Amino acid sequence: MGTVTTSDGTNIFYKDWGPRDGLPVVFHHGWPLSADDWDNQMLFFLSHGYRVIAHDRRGHGRSDQPSTGHDMDTYAADVAALTEALDLRGAVHIGHSTGGGEVARYVARAEPGRVAKAVLVSAVPPVMVKSDTNPDGLPLEVFDEFRAALAANRAQFYIDVPSGPFYGFNREGATVSQGLIDHWWLQGMMGAANAHYECIAAFSETDFTDDLKRIDVPVLVAHGTDDQVVPYADAAPKSAELLANATLKSYEGLPHGMLSTHPEVLNPDLLAFVKS
């Protein structure tokens, strides 16, 4: 564990486990979580001999809580600072949800040789919010409701999200894990309310179309068809179509947080893609 200081003085917390000569796999978490959300996958890849790295986005987890920089350009710049500090080359970057947007923006701008492959898991690209150019997106009012709920009672909102749509625990017959709900809440409450509030616009309104078009490394696009947070039809197949070298993997009936609810399904596919 350590920190890297960005150009604006923000300290970014990160974990760095495994052999320094191992192939680096970098994990990017979703909103409003932390690097801890990838614990299962980090241990899995560590057991296969990889070097595994994950950071807490600014304003999230154990990183600093600055008043500025809660946008995709800055998130990507923070990742660049981390990869440069650790001198990561030929890395695989895996992003979930908001972290998938961060991966898209970073990889599209990365120095040659820094990135070998990327994975977008239940990721927000190409763009979430509805507009004239994205008529199938979610109405802005959905994200206004997110902001209102966060501002009114963040602690309760951070119980409601994982108890319901995030993990699909609101579906009939779902096996509810109180541990996952509590873990989600704890990660969320570690971060800064202002950062989480502003990040809602970052993950919902940022258009990653041009980023996806610029990426030329192989990309696995993995998404559950019962994603109630980032609807499958307006995300994964559209991203795969924009990417030059994409593999689309659909998971029938799996939720947004499938990396935690179904790691035994997702992890082997991630490993196979990294090794391919």
Swiss-Prot record:
Subunit relationships: Homodimer.
Cited PANTHER family: HYDROLASE, ALPHA/BETA FOLD FAMILY PROTEIN, NON-HEME CHLOROPEROXIDASE
Any one Pfam family match given in the protein's UniProt record, by short name: Abhydrolase_1
Domain annotation AB hydrolase-1: ranges: 24-254
Family to which this protein belongs: Belongs to the AB hydrolase superfamily. Bacterial non-heme haloperoxidase / perhydrolase family.
Gene3D superfamilies linked: alpha/beta hydrolase
Active site as annotated: 97, 227, 256
Keywords, alphabetical: Chloride, Oxidoreductase, Peroxidase
InterPro entries named in the record: AB_hydrolase (IPR050471), AB_hydrolase_1 (IPR000073), AB_hydrolase_fold (IPR029058), Epox_hydrolase-like (IPR000639)
Protein name per the record: Non-heme chloroperoxidase
One of the record's GO molecular function terms: chloride peroxidase activity
Keyword match Oxidoreductase: yes
Domain of life: Bacteria
EC number(s) stated in the UniProt entry for this protein: 1.11.1.-
